[in-house]
Amino acid sequence: MEALKEYTRARDAKKRMFKKAKQELLSFLLRNGKSYPESGNYWTEKFFKWIKTVQFSEKWMQEALNEYLSEVYSLKAKIELMDARIREIAELEIVKDKVDKLICFSGIDVITAVETVVEINDFSRFATAAQFVSYLGLCPGEDSSGKTKNMLPLTKAGNKRVRALFCESAKAIKRTNPYGQKSKRILERQKNASPEIVAYADKATKRIRTKMKHLEERGKNYNVSSAAGARELACFVWGMMNGKIA
C-alpha cells in the first residue's frame, strides 16, 4: 500500500507543477500584451487553438513562448498517463472493494477514491466518525475560558491531503443537480453497487448540498461552507468504510 501511496503522491506533485506551469504561461502572455479574448475561460480547447495563433516578431520571444507552452503540454500528458495508471490501480484487489464503494458518492471519482484509500488504508482504526474527522483536521478549534466557548478556524492537523480531496469533493457535490436527477457519470459508477450503498451515498449528497447551501444563505463564505461539506462527507465516508450505512 505504501508504494501505491507514493505513486499517487507523485501524481499530485505533477499536478502542482502543472498548475505553476500554467500560471507562468499566462503571466508571460499578459506581461507581453497577449491577452486571451475570453479572459478567465482558460485551458479549454478554444484557448489552446487561440494560443497557437500567438506570434512574436522577435525570435527569442517566440522561443520563450514555445518553452512555456511545451512545459504545459508535457506535464498535461504526464498527468493523463498517471491518471490512466491510477485507474489500473483501482482494479487491484487490495483497494478495489473500498474504491467501488467510495465512487458511489457524488463528487468522488476514481482518482479521488484511490488516493483516499491508499492514504487511509485501514478505516477501522478510527472508532468513531468524529475521530476520523479530527484526523483529517476538519474539526473547528475551540478556545474555552470559563463558561465561554469561542469556535476557532479548522485545526488543519492531520492528513492535509485527504482533507483537500474532501473539500474539492464537497464543492463538486454542491454543483450537482438539486432536483434529484443523477448524471450519467454517477449512474455508471453506482450501477454495480447494492441498493443500500447507493441509498446511503445519495443521502450524503443531499445532506452535504443542503448544508452548504444553508451556510451560504446565512452569509458564510465559500471556504467555510466547503469545509463544512467536507466534514459531513468525511463522516459519511467513515460510515461507508466501516459498514455503518443502516
Role assignments for model-derived ranges:
Residues Y7-K101, Q190-K191:
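Glycine-rich, often acidic, oxyanion-interacting loops/wings at catalytic, nucleic-acid
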Residues R16, E80, I111, N223-V224:
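Short, solvent-exposed positions on alpha-helices
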Residues L26, R87, I103, V117-V118, ...:
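Amphipathic alpha-helical segments within well-ordered protein domains
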Residues L69, V99, I103, V110-V117:
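Short, well-structured alpha-helical segments
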Residues D100-S106, P153-A157:
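Cytochrome P450 C-terminal beta-domain/meander region
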Residues T112-T128:
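Catalytic palm subdomain of template-directed nucleic-acid polymerases
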Residues L136-A246:
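A basic, often C-terminal nucleic-acid-binding module that engages the phosphate backbone, implemented
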